[in-house]
């Protein structure tokens, strides 16, 4: 229904130029792209303004994007007046990188990625690998450029994608937990037995 409504909202020449599935979205020679203002209007209608605000607020500056982020395990700011952003204070900290696709609108989208393999659940913020930092995904709508050309302009259609927006802490699968417990039990048994001790026979 959403696709049909979107195509009905377009000029007749756009709807008639909708591409067939399976064709590569290469821009035909002599076909210009749509004006940025028009793409923003169409995207705003689909996203109802919410995702547009999300897109603009999460865009990173050049310095932040170039920063080499790493897992802040056990790290505490020397200056207590400095309060890191929420994504770095989480037990599953994450950072953002910018995804660029010239055939998509918005062409730039922020994507979250986890900084740690485990979770910072230790007493002093140490990383605990019994838990795992996992990305959290959110569905969103974008405009995708198609191979069709109408009136000398490229035709766009709506497409639904999922993007990572943050990270959360989840327990490791039971198989891994059992393996860790088994390893701990074996080490404990070695400590209890002396070098000349051997398990009693049946």
Curated annotation (Swiss-Prot):
Known glycosylation sites? 68, 181
What's the protein called, per UniProt? Interleukin-17D
Q: Which domain of life is it from?
A: Eukaryota
Top-down, what is the taxonomic lineage of the species of origin?
Answer: Eukaryota, Metazoa, Chordata, Craniata, Vertebrata
The entry sums up its family as follows: Belongs to the IL-17 family.
Q: Does the keyword ATP-binding apply?
A: no
Q: Which GO terms describe its molecular function?
A: cytokine activity; protein homodimerization activity; receptor ligand activity
Major subcellular location class: secreted
Species the sequence originates in: Homo sapiens (Human)
Q: Which SUPFAM superfamilies match?
A: Cystine-knot cytokines (SSF57501)
UniProt keyword annotations, A-Z:
Cytokine, Glycoprotein, Secreted, Signal
């Amino acid at each position: 229904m959403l696709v049909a409504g979107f195509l009905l909202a377009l000029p007749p020449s756009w709807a008639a130029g909708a591409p067939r599935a399976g064709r590569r979205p290469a821009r035909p020679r002599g076909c210009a792209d749509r004006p940025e203002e028009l793409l923003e209007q169409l995207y705003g209608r689909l996203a109802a303004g919410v995702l547009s605000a999300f897109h603009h607020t999460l865009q990173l500056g050049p310095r932040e994007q170039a920063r080499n982020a790493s897992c802040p395990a056990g790290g505490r700011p020397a200056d207590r007046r400095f309060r890191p952003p929420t994504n770095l204070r989480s037990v599953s900290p994450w950072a953002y990188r910018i995804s660029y696709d010239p055939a998509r609108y918005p062409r730039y989208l922020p994507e979250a990625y986890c900084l740690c393999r485990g979770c910072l659940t230790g007493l002093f913020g140490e990383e605990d690998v019994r838990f795992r930092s996992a990305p959290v995904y959110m569905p969103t709508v974008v405009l995708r450029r198609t191979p069709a050309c109408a009136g000398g302009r490229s035709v766009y259609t709506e497409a639904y994608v999922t993007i990572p927006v943050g990270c959360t802490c989840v327990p490791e699968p039971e198989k891994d937990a059992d393996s860790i417990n088994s390893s701990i039990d074996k080490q404990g048994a070695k400590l209890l037995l002396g070098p000349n001790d051997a398990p009693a026979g049946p």
